[in-house]
Amino acid sequence: MNTPEHSQLGKSSAYVDQYDASLLFPIPRAEKRAEIGVTGTPPFFGADMWTAFELSWLNMRGKPQVALAHITVPCESPNIVESKSFKLYLNSFNNTRFSDARDVRERIRADINAAVGAGVGVKTLGPELFDREPVHELDGLSLDRLDVECIHFTPAPELLFAEFDEPPVDETLTSNLLKSNCLVTGQPDWGSVQISYSGPQINQEGLLQYLVSFRNHNEFHEQCVERIFMDVWTRCRPLKLSVYARYTRRGGLDINPFRTSHPQALPANIRMARQ
């Protein structure tokens, strides 16, 4: 079984500029999910939405082409792709000739499908569409307005509680203070998070302190979002819950996981100012 420690993270890597799908390094989701009590079918839906900002290849005459790519990996997939391997894989397109962007798109789709064990979505955008890529902050009431004392810097779910004796509410809360660290290298990962729910009102001070408590925690983006979802779901017992995080890019890639308790359309993959 592939483990994060066997990946290229934190190691010197040769940059290959001829297409090589074997560079992709899948990691099973199951082990980290078991840590948060998720075995079998997960109690959530959603996807991991990737944006690739450094995609380039050669056309059939050797002229470089560039594009952005949006890749959507369903959370039902048994595997994720380790992000450095994804970067190295995309770099392998650099001196490889493809007939057109569709050929590139279909090649990426087939390779990521095989790596994660599920069907993924891939969309490419050429330079003529770059100015249509908007920038927008997460909608909702900012928790960051609260003046709270923070003393926990590893996940502290005991900070979460809700007003079970009060009428239920519908709320969307956001924070730009999410930070965790790469599971293998310990490098900082910076993110913003949006939590939407229906049910007993969640104490906002405790929720903000809980989100801050990820600050020294080592885990991949997808795993952090699932941990947040499960902690809020079990401790605050909402009727409905969605957790959406957008992380700043590294190596030309950003990862934006979304998890929800009920089937719904994915949020638009619109980058934030920090991305």
Swiss-Prot record:
Ligand binding (NADPH): S83, K84, R250, G251
Origin organism lineage: Bacteria, Pseudomonadati, Pseudomonadota, Betaproteobacteria, Burkholderiales
Active site positions: C182, D189
Top-level taxon: Bacteria
EC number from the UniProt entry: 1.7.1.13
Similarity comment: family membership: Belongs to the GTP cyclohydrolase I family. QueF type 2 subfamily.
Subcellular location: Cytoplasm
The name this protein goes by in its record: NADPH-dependent 7-cyano-7-deazaguanine reductase
SS bond list: none
Key words of the record: Cytoplasm, NADP, Oxidoreductase, Queuosine biosynthesis
Main location (coarse class): cytoplasm
Function, in words: Catalyzes the NADPH-dependent reduction of 7-cyano-7-deazaguanine (preQ0) to 7-aminomethyl-7-deazaguanine (preQ1).
Originating organism: Polaromonas sp. (strain JS666 / ATCC BAA-500)
